[in-house]
A protein has these predicted regions:
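Short alpha-helical transmembrane segments in multi-pass integral membrane proteins
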Residues: 24, 35-90, 146-211, 252-290
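Membrane-water interface regions at transmembrane-helix termini and the short interhelical loops
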Residues: 1-9, 29-41
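Short runs within selected transmembrane alpha-helices of multi-pass transporters and secretion channels
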Residues: 1-6, 14-25, 43-56, 136-139, ...
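Alpha-helical transmembrane segments of polytopic integral membrane proteins
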Residues: 29, 59-62, 103, 107, ...
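Hydrophobic positions within alpha-helical transmembrane segments of bacterial inner-membrane proteins
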Residues: 22, 26, 30, 43, ...
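Hydrophobic faces of transmembrane alpha-helices in multi-pass small-molecule transporters and flippases
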Residues: 12-19, 57-60, 74-105, 109, ...
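Helix-terminus/linker motif at the lipid-water interface of multi-pass membrane proteins
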Residues: 31-38, 97-130, 148-149, 186-195, ...
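Small-residue-rich hydrophobic transmembrane alpha-helices
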Residues: 1-14, 107, 120-184, 215-237
Length: 290
């Protein structure tokens, strides 16, 4: 739904749905984990309930749009469309599946440090999402702008659009980095007030704060690559360095405790953002010549 609606110019619908899920998750996480003492199960239930609500919001919006009214699900699809979709979508789908598997392992590792660490990661990641959700929106815009101008062979506009998008996303990444590093206590205490949990939350936000700029530019650059129809480079970078989180987390957590897991996530994001931006710059210099 997110991809279709954004490509069709209905980004407001996706914003409403994802924001609803984010806010609901922020509320349900501490309630189910601590008030009802469900711990890890509570974190899982919060995510499931939020996802259900997001899906319902998407379905409600979809039935009111002309885009979905004439769809015939049982009609025979055209083979050339299927092959093109697979060519573009397969790398990204593999990337998403592996990311989920890696995240499951990381979550298991985090749970070994206790319920407090699970709660910190759940709430902290929702706070951190102010960064990547905004970057996702700009990534969709860069994707659309890039694909339109690439198809029209306006390569100079492709480059200029990427530079402009990166400037905006970079400024947002710097802002979120500053906020998470210098104001972690006031932000985290808005959601969890227990004094024994707050120091862990502060550590999480500070450590992840260092990677926000790089995560934002990685997401934006992925949108540019996708707009060119080149989904393989972002997938390669993401698969390799997201997979690296597992050995890094195991090694660093041995010395730093759960903070080692946070550092593994943050360091991998910094590396991914740096490499993908360099890759796109080199690619555009070689291939996008007017």
């Amino acid at each position: 739904f997110t991809g279709i609606l954004t490509a069709a110019g209905h980004s407001k619908s996706t914003f409403i749905a994802t924001t609803t899920g984010l806010v609901l998750n922020l509320i349900l996480d501490p309630v189910l984990i601590f008030v009802f003492n469900l711990r890890v199960i509570g974190a899982a239930l919060a995510t499931i309930l939020a996802q259900i609500i997001v899906t319902l919001v998407f379905l409600y919006n979809a039935k009111n749009l002309d885009l979905f009214r004439n769809i015939r699900i049982l009609s025979k699809p055209e083979l050339n469309h299927i092959s093109e979709i697979l060519k573009i979508g397969f790398p990204s789908s593999v990337q998403s599946m592996l990311f989920t598997c890696i995240s499951m392992y990381i979550a298991r590792l985090i749970s070994s440090f206790g319920a407090i660490s699970v709660a910190v990661q759940k709430v902290g990641s929702q706070i951190e999402s102010i960064s990547w959700m905004a970057a996702d929106g700009f990534s969709a815009s860069i994707n659309a702008f890039t694909s339109q101008n690439y198809g029209a062979k306006n390569y100079d506009r492709v480059k200029q659009g990427y530079k402009t998008g990166m400037l905006v996303v970079g400024l947002w990444g710097l802002l979120t980095t500053a906020v998470l590093i210098f104001l972690p206590g006031p932000i985290f205490s808005c959601f969890i007030h227990e004094t024994n949990i707050l120091p862990y939350g502060i550590d999480y936000l500070i450590i992840l704060g260092y990677s926000q700029l790089f995560m934002c530019i990685e997401i934006a650059t992925q949108g540019a690559f996708n707009g060119l129809g080149k989904t393989l480079p972002p997938s390669i970078v993401s698969i390799i360095f997201t997979s690296a989180r597992i050995p890094m987390a195991i090694l660093l957590s041995h010395y730093l405790g759960v903070n080692g897991v946070w550092w593994a996530i943050s360091i991998s994001s910094i590396i991914k953002g740096t490499i993908l931006v360099i890759w796109f710059i080199l690619y555009s210099k070689r291939r996008l010549i007017s």
